A protein has these predicted regions:
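Flexible "arm" and connector segments at domain edges
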Residues: 1-97
Length: 97
């Protein structure tokens, strides 16, 4: 796993923030297309996993380049905890907002 983290940082350092921001926007668009196809067809397209991987890789690079790892981690934990509390308040009711 450390090799992956090291390589993600190496790629980010090579391309720099502006390039990777543009690339992230492009990849988010491609993921949006795939998710839209999935919603229309009620099937997961072949490219979905690839597009998700692209977005995760680029988001990881942006978090590193912005130097906000701790802030993102803290928000990640906060938002998950908040949603679990919402679910628990609803009890067994599966209605979604």
């Amino acid at each position: 796993m450390q090799d992956i983290e090291k390589n993600i940082k190496r790629i980010a350092d090579y391309y720099k923030v502006k390039h990777q921001e543009k690339k992230l926007v492009e990849e988010l668009g491609e993921l949006l297309v795939e998710i839209s196809k999935n919603m229309i067809t009620n099937k997961v397209t072949e490219n979905t996993a690839s597009e998700i991987a692209d977005v995760i890789i680029l988001l990881t690079q942006i978090v590193y380049l912005y130097d906000i790892e701790q802030e993102v981690y803290d928000k990640f934990i906060y938002k998950i905890d908040r949603e679990i509390k919402r679910i628990l308040r609803r009890g067994n009711n599966n209605e979604k907002d």
